[in-house]
Amino acid sequence: MLPMITGFMNYGQQTLRAARYIGQGFMITLSHTNRLPVTIQYPYEKVITSERFRGRIHFEFDKCIACEVCVRVCPIDLPVVDWKLETNIRKKRLLNYSIDFGICIFCGNCVEYCPTNCLSMTEEYEFSTYDRHELNYNQIALGRLPMSVIDDYTIRTILNSPQTKNG
């Protein structure tokens, strides 16, 4: 009879332990019910990017002096700079400037080291396309400024920074 009583006691202890574990899991689930959802409904909602976000590169053709510093500091030698030497004024004249965003790693070295600040990072990050050759931007495509997410009335913007509590 003694083994039967110890068996019932072990069964009772295991039942209580299982109920405690189930209760702990349920309490964790209940603690998450008051939180805001983390998922963003992407095409209709967008996160406002931070100030230092490295998106598509914007290029100003008039400021460029064709020094090719951007090519030298790029880890993958990506920007293609075509220029012609004007012998009468002894200066380089920029003919073509292009960047293939299918290869670009968005490190920002070209923007940081440009002596004339003709390159800047924008908040544009949508590069989806069916043909990867459309990701090769010339100076005309690089010169276009993207539409700001904040100005787009069809999209609800969500702040990226965590909300701080005063108190």
From Swiss-Prot:
GO terms for biological process: photosynthesis, light reaction. It is a peripheral membrane protein. Keywords: 4Fe-4S, Chloroplast, Iron, Iron-sulfur, Membrane, Metal-binding, NAD, NADP, Plastid, Plastoquinone, Quinone, Repeat, Thylakoid, Translocase. InterPro entries: 4Fe4S_Fe-S-bd (IPR017896), 4Fe4S_Fe_S_CS (IPR017900), NADH_quinone_OxRdtase_chainI (IPR010226), NDHI (IPR004497). [4Fe-4S] cluster 2 binds at C74, C104, C107, C110. The keyword Mitochondrion does not apply. [4Fe-4S] cluster 1 binds at C64, C67, C70, C114. It is an enzyme of class 7 (translocase). It comes from the Eukaryota. Its EC number is 7.1.1.-. GO terms for molecular function: 4 iron, 4 sulfur cluster binding; iron ion binding; NADH dehydrogenase (ubiquinone) activity; quinone binding. Residues 55-84, 95-124 form the 4Fe-4S ferredoxin-type domain. Binds 2 [4Fe-4S] clusters per subunit. GO terms for cellular component: chloroplast thylakoid membrane. Belongs to the complex I 23 kDa subunit family. NDH shuttles electrons from NAD(P)H:plastoquinone, via FMN and iron-sulfur (Fe-S) centers, to quinones in the photosynthetic chain and possibly in a chloroplast respiratory chain. The immediate electron acceptor for the enzyme in this species is believed to be plastoquinone. Couples the redox reaction to proton translocation, and thus conserves the redox energy in a proton gradient. This is NAD(P)H-quinone oxidoreductase subunit I, chloroplastic. It comes from Lobularia maritima (Sweet alyssum). The lineage of its organism: Eukaryota, Viridiplantae, Streptophyta, Embryophyta, Tracheophyta. The gene is ndhI.
